[in-house]
């Protein structure tokens, strides 16, 4: 764990359950006050908020579909009203559903594009008025954006690769504003609810052949990487998190 302080910093995390909960608690332990937004998982977001509040942090929970520009603007307005600023934006909203090439439908493209591309773009663009020089944006791409592919996830891979491209392109425009943007490119971290345990173990085995590790170790490394990126003074980076298996 990095021994630095985020006291006085306001962090917006899109997605307050699963890995989002671990990240929120990790940032709260360093002193950050939090904004947790959710689309459907209110209970999980509230549970995360309770954990952060027990650490003495101020937490706001907001319902927000990050793919909807109007909804994102409302969330930004609430953040401005309550906190006046935003120091760190962590973009975690994601879907991970298998679909073979022959069975891809228009809806598969639409859902992946909405969540990964629009759901990354709108919070960044609309939050900029609240962000001062020295602020940080942390997006989540995928290891396939910079390394080996795996079958059965084409819409996911294409749209997550777009997040990596967006990160590098935005870094050029945000540089003069003094705002840093970087992306994490992880392998599989936590099993999605709609994937069987057998399929999940197959995905993990293919991803971590060189370094067999537990889900707990993977999650902690993800949390630690997010924390590190809250302090870096570089921008446009794509940080692999796959334990060397590119």
Q: Over which residues does each language-model region extend?
A:
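Catalytic loop of short-chain dehydrogenase/reductase
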Residues: 138-162, 167-176, 188-189
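C-terminal substrate-recognition "lid" of short-chain dehydrogenase/reductases
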Residues: 130, 218-242
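A short, exposed helix-loop element centered on a Lys and neighboring polar residues
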Residues: 124-125, 168
């Amino acid at each position: 764990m990095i021994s630095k302080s985020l006291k006085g910093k306001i962090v917006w995390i899109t997605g307050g359950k699963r890995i989002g909960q671990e990240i929120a608690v990790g940032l709260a332990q360093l002193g950050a006050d939090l904004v947790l937004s959710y689309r459907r998982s209110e209970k999980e977001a509230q549970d995360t908020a309770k954990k952060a509040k027990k650490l003495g942090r101020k937490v706001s929970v907001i319902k927000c579909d990050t793919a909807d520009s109007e909804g994102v603007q409302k969330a930004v307005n609430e953040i401005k009203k309550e906190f006046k600023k935003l120091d760190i934006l962590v973009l975690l909203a994601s879907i991970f559903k298998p679909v073979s090439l022959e069975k891809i439908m228009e809806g598969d493209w639409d859902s992946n594009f909405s969540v990964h591309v629009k759901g990354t773009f709108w919070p960044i663009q609309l939050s900029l008025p609240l962000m001062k020089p020295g602020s940080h944006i942390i997006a989540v791409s995928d290891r396939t954006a910079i390394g080996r592919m795996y079958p059965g996830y084409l819409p996911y891979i294409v749209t997550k690769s777009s997040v990596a491209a967006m990160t590098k392109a935005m870094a050029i425009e945000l540089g003069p504003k003094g705002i840093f943007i970087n992306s994490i490119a992880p392998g599989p971290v936590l099993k999605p609810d709609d994937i069987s345990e057998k399929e999940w173990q197959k995905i993990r085995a293919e991803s971590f052949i060189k370094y067999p590790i537990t889900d707990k170790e993977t999650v902690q490394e993800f949390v630690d990487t997010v924390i590190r990126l809250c302090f870096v003074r570089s921008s446009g980076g794509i940080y692999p998190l796959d334990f060397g298996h590119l």
